[in-house]
Curated annotation (Swiss-Prot):
The gene is Krtap21-1. Keywords: Keratin, Repeat. It comes from Mus musculus (Mouse). Interacts with hair keratins. Induction: Expression in skin and hair follicle is regulated by HOXC13 and by GATA3. This is Keratin-associated protein 21-1.
Amino acid sequence: MCCNYYGNSCGGCGYGSRYGYGCGYGSGYGCGYGSGYGCGYGSGYGCGYGSGYGCGYGSGYGCGYGSGYGCGYGSGYGCGYGSGYGCGYGSGYGCGYGSGYGCGYGSRYGCGYGSGCCSYRKCYSSCC
C-alpha cells in the first residue's frame, strides 16, 4: 500500500484531490495546492506554484521558478530542483520532491507527500 502524508493510498493522494489520480492540496486532476490538472501550488495543467501548463513557481509551460518552457533549478527537460523530465525537487519524469513520474514530495508515479510506495518521512529524503 502506498500512502501520502495523510495516509491515502497511491493513485489518489494528497491533501484534497478531487479525482484521486493526481494529488496535492486541492487539485482537480493533478497535484499541488490548487491546480486544475497538473500539480503544484496553483497551476492550470502542469505543476508548480502558479504555472499555466508546466510546473514551477510561475512559468507558463515549462517549470521551475520562472521559466517559460524549460525547467527550474537543474533538470534536463522538465523542471524543479533536479528532475530529468518533469518537475520538482528531484524526480525523473514527473514533479515533486523526489518522484519518478508523478508529482509531490516523494511519490513514484502519483503525487502528493509520499505516494508510490513510500511514506512521507521515507520519501522526503529518498523514495523507494
